[in-house]
Amino acid sequence: MPYTIPNNSCVGCDNCRPQCPTGAIKLENDKYWIDPCLCNNCEGYYPEPQCVIACPTNSPIPWHAKRGRCKVDLREVTSPDLFSNGKSNPFASAIVIWEACNLLSQRASLPWETDEQGNLCYRRQVNQGKGAIAFHLTTSPQSSEPVTQLAAVETLDIRAACLHLIFAAYATTLDQPWEQEFTVDERQLEKYLGLEKRKDLSKNVKLTLINNLVQQACSLVVSIDWPQQGMLKGFSIKGSRLWELVQVQRHFQEDNLGCKYLVGLTFKIRAGVWAQYFLNKQACKERTAFYQYGSLPKSLLTTVMSIWQQHEGAARLMLWLLFKTKMGASQRITVPTLMRVAYGEEKIAQACRQREERKRLLRTFEHDLEVLNHHGMKSVFDPVTYPPTIQPLWARIVDIPEDPDEALEFWINDGSGTSRLTDVSPRGKWNLLMNARILSFSLP
């Protein structure tokens, strides 16, 4: 159980803070606060809580969740809300934003490598190999120390990609996002992510989740080598924050003992140097930079937040297709490409070697396509390479009429044909799918 410090009885000796093994004890506005998400009762470090032992007045007491309303009297004015039409909002959609979204959603499934300094790096060539984008992950937004172990990448939360997209949307509201900041608080983020409807989650749990996701989205460092394109001169960016976490304001309420309870968070964030080249309105008019943006559906954020545990593959595909569909009405995406995005290269390799893994992956893939269809991302199958015989059953029965008489006629005609809707899949379906394509996906 976490501990808390009643400031009314605290003498301010500061003996406890250096003794805390998790760094949970913090000084906010000359008053002590123990972060309940970091405090673990010194379990795994010491047999007893060190703050209790170090305190001359035995002030620390067990923490209990705050009861009643969480109200913040004074807050800084935040940036205007996104999604003013209730449906969508412009967002920065440059290749650097797309690849960062891939990194946060696909994580260890991507081909990470070790650079010359021994740090983990995700690198992607651009413009037919003439340029490159490289990402490093730091231990925190406040640290410049890059991670060196893949285990750190595996701890990333796919939901951090939603925060990344929200930041990309806020960046489009500024004229010079690489110099200007936007301010967003936990109430706005709860609304965008659908967390305000989660009555099963306490305020403290929501604040902890939002803070962790913001920290992860702001832990990316990007380097870009971009070749000359027409009038646009080539440029190079080395080790720049993708999103700079300028400030985190914590809002507290105190009880009658002086115990501080975290009830709100406000974040000040600024886009990195990349925005000067990919989200520059004035320079775009002068044809010396890009201004690349797309449309972010609000429903995509809430859908990813609701399906990420049971259908991570579908969530990955939704985030990837958000950018892919921007490239044109017809994408002609191969099934292996979709599987690589949804499950990673290693799982596909296992499926190619093992029959049971192959069957399992096929079922998962077809179910994930159904989830996408249910949430408005409808797929158009290529009739040549992806005929009805190898399409998922849900896609084949979608044309069954709802009218009973018409449905009866449909089944009579189906039964008298050479192939039936309920026929089992042909032998070698996996090999057929490896050459199949989906012509397009629609965004919700």
Task: Tell me the role of every PLM-derived stretch.
Residues 67-444:
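Charged, alpha-helix-forming regions
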Residues 19-20, 55:
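Cysteine-centered loop/knuckle micro-motif
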Residues 1-12, 23-47, 59, 64:
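Ferredoxin-like iron-sulfur electron-transfer modules
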Residues 15:
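Residue-level recognition of oxygen-bearing side chains
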Residues 50-54:
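Short, disulfide-bonded extracellular cysteine-rich repeat modules
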